[in-house]
Amino acid sequence: ASFSARRDGSFAFGTNNKFGNFFAGSLGWIVSDEDFFKVNFIDYLKLRGSFGITGNENVNPQFQRISTLTYAYGTGQNAGYTFGNDPTSIGATIASFKNEDLGWEKQKQLNAGFDLNFSNSKFSLTADYFEKQISGLLFTPSLSLYLGTASAPTANIGTTKTSGFDLNLGYNNATGKNWKVSSNLTFTTAKNEVTETNNGLITGGGYG
């Protein structure tokens, strides 16, 4: 068994969401080593499981909790301001909007499965169930052109869920002193879904 815990802080987020608590734990049990286990054709059986929470602070720029300004200069791009006979006076415009409520994107991961060897370890079977849920997805939506060319603030937009199974069946057999036959068959299934959004509508590109 193992367990770990940590508390991380990021200047990318607002004051109330600056810190996040994350942990992970795993358990394993070799059932075939127990005295009560009397199944002769099974050589090895291990049950295992794990669960953990991790955080993502990957936002750009990192100072999402404040609005930023940029200077405007030069008539060639129609970016300057004109006063009298000077057509290139420097001005300032909003470069990005702030989001004081921005917080950690959190990923919860659950795994459960077993490892099995049988028939004098000629055959092996590994099976896993996995489930991953990402909440507080970090996403930068599109802004209306009425707001100018400023960058939209990154937001926590919703939740996604991925779940499925992994199966691996193996065969290993020594057919002679210098020969060995091995083969593996793998099967995987996965289901991905968006389970929640802030307003039912997401505009813009992808996330991640």
Can you describe what each PLM-predicted range is?
Residues 1-208:
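Extracellular/periplasmic, surface-exposed regions of secreted and cell-surface proteins
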